[in-house]
C-alpha cells in the first residue's frame, strides 16, 4: 500500500496531511513526522479551539482567506487533511516536501 505524501500540489491547490500538536509553546510548522507535516499551535484541543486556531495560522502562513481553507478530514483527531486553494506563499518547510 502506497502512503500518501505529507504535501501534495494539485493544480493551484495544496493538500496537507497534518499531525497537529495543540497546547504547544508556539505556533509553527515543525517539519515531517511519520509522513505527515507536524504543526504545533498554542490553542487547547477543546470545543474546536485547536481547529479554529490551526485554520487561522494556516491562513496567515499561506496568505489565503481563512474561509477558503477546507478541513477535509480529522475534525476530532490530531491527524488532519487540509486543502489550501491558491496559496499566495508556500513556506520553505512545506516547499521542500513538494515533489
Swiss-Prot record:
A cellular component term, taken from the record's GO annotations: cytoplasm
Annotated signal peptide: none
UniProt-listed SUPFAM superfamilies: YggU-like
Alphabetical list of InterPro entries matching this protein: DUF167 (IPR003746), YggU-like_sf (IPR036591)
Top-level taxon of the source organism: Bacteria
PANTHER family: UPF0235 PROTEIN C15ORF40 (PTHR13420:SF7)
Family label: Belongs to the UPF0235 family.
Protein name (record): UPF0235 protein PM1313
Source organism: Pasteurella multocida (strain Pm70)
